[in-house]
Amino acid sequence: MRAFLIGRWQPFHKGHLEIIKKISKEVDEIIIGIGSCQKSHTLTDPFTAGERMMMITKTLENYDINYYAIPINDIDYNAVWVSSVESLTPPFTTVYTGNSLVRELFSEKNYTVKKPELYNRTDYSGTKIRKKMLEGSDWEHLVPKEVVKVIEEIDGINRIRRLSEKDYDEE
């Protein structure tokens, strides 16, 4: 059985890894959708699809998990989004998502939809991790070591800090 899991992975963290490890015990292959792949260089989506692909693939090299990582664009027409996903991915029968819109769209197309249990959401939240990066707090323990290396390679911390700067002083 092949399943689809979509996320923004901004950044890929240990909570994501635990969800993927759990799903991998239930299915033969996982299609990891890199959602909102067209978005980058913002405070909520600082990393490019390619950078997120590196985070995921470099991390999963260390695990016996069969997967495909595929960039998935947002489109402005929800009724055809599932068809767009289907055109970009190998066939799958099951969708794992915690997003109510994604759950509804795939349910309407008769997919089996499962809601994965979040792993320690208190600590493992992309929003909280990005905030820690911005503030200079410790964040490295919340992501796999391979993700730390990717973020260092792309100078991701300084990118986030530059993105938070105002263009002009406000009086």
Swiss-Prot record:
Family annotation (Pfam families): CTP_transf_like (PF01467)
Pathway stated in the Swiss-Prot or TrEMBL entry: Cofactor biosynthesis; NAD(+) biosynthesis; NAD(+) from nicotinamide D-ribonucleotide: step 1/1
Catalytic activity: beta-nicotinamide D-ribonucleotide + ATP + H(+) = diphosphate + NAD(+)
Subcellular location: Cytoplasm
SUPFAM superfamilies: Nucleotidylyl transferase (SSF52374)
Segments traversing the membrane: none
Family: Belongs to the archaeal NMN adenylyltransferase family.
HAMAP family on file: NMN_adenylyltr
Protein name: Nicotinamide-nucleotide adenylyltransferase
